[in-house]
A protein has these predicted regions:
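N-terminal secretory/membrane targeting signals
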Residues: 1-24
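Hydrophobic alpha-helical segments and their helix-loop boundaries in membrane
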Residues: 22-250
């Protein structure tokens, strides 16, 4: 009991010693609220902050829709479905592999953006608008290489703009949906080629089971081992990844 009382006195003494120094401390005043813009510059700065916050919020979608991610993840998902292995590989593995391959394929484009736009802007050598113009150009060049003329002509016509004479005349808001449509078309074309051998195995296994009178035995359960052994023997992941990466090199 005496020990507890002594400890209480000790803490009380320390508190009384620290209290004067705490009273002398000054704390910053933080105000969060809406204030009227007194000058056009204040309004412009606030609008720029709002735009940048919106861009940061949409950054994952921008990364997905302006790079090769769409084609990669669709083909990998169709490959998993063709194998008939259920959720193997899991979605995290499919998405992670597609994301890693995206950074690998887009590395030259990202390096060009870093050298021509980001680094000069960080060193205050160019203005913000110049950095944006330089940064978007490598992305536009990449999208143009993968965009089909049919899809581009469709959105140019739907946008009701004058027929572009050069690539620079094509607005980004027209190029972006054209690129996405082209990527989906290419992805499903590759997916069909990948799906076909596994479909043949399913048909053969089903025919054999019907001829043997085993109509109530699920064909997918029998076909799965044959699909897996064929996929491993031909080094399927190597061929698919190799074909996907090379499809962006033109």
């Amino acid at each position: 009991m005496n020990i507890m009382r002594k400890l209480g006195y000790l803490f009380l003494g320390l508190f009384m010693t620290i209290l004067p120094s705490c009273a002398a401390m000054t704390f910053p005043n933080i105000n969060i609220g809406l204030q009227n813009a007194n000058t056009p510059q204040d309004f412009t700065n606030g609008l720029q902050i709002l735009i940048w916050l919106t861009i940061l919020t949409l950054a994952p979608s921008i990364l997905i829709l302006t790079t090769c991610f769409v084609r990669l993840v669709v083909v990998l998902a169709l490959t998993r479905q063709a194998l008939g292995a259920g959720t193997l590989p899991p979605n995290q593995v499919i998405t992670g592999l597609a994301l890693i391959l995206t950074f690998f394929i887009m590395a030259p484009t990202f390096n060009e953006i870093n050298e021509k736009a980001l680094q000069p802007y960080m060193k205050n050598q160019i203005t913000q608008q110049v950095a944006i113009d330089r940064g978007i150009q490598p992305i536009r060049n990449f999208m143009f290489k993968q965009t089909h003329e049919k899809e581009l002509a469709l959105f140019v016509r739907m946008a009701k703009i004058e027929k572009p004479k050069t690539k620079e005349d094509v607005p980004t808001y027209v190029l972006l949906p054209s690129f996405i449509m082209s990527e989906l078309k290419t992805a499903f074309t590759i997916g069909f080629v990948v799906y076909l051998p596994f479909l043949v195995i399913d048909i053969v296994v089903s025919s054999v089971l019907v001829s043997m009178g085993m109509m109530f035995l699920p064909p997918t359960m029998i076909a799965l081992p044959f699909k897996l052994i064929m996929f491993v023997m031909v080094d399927g992941w190597y061929l698919i990844v190799k074909s996907l990466v090379e499809s962006f090199v033109k």
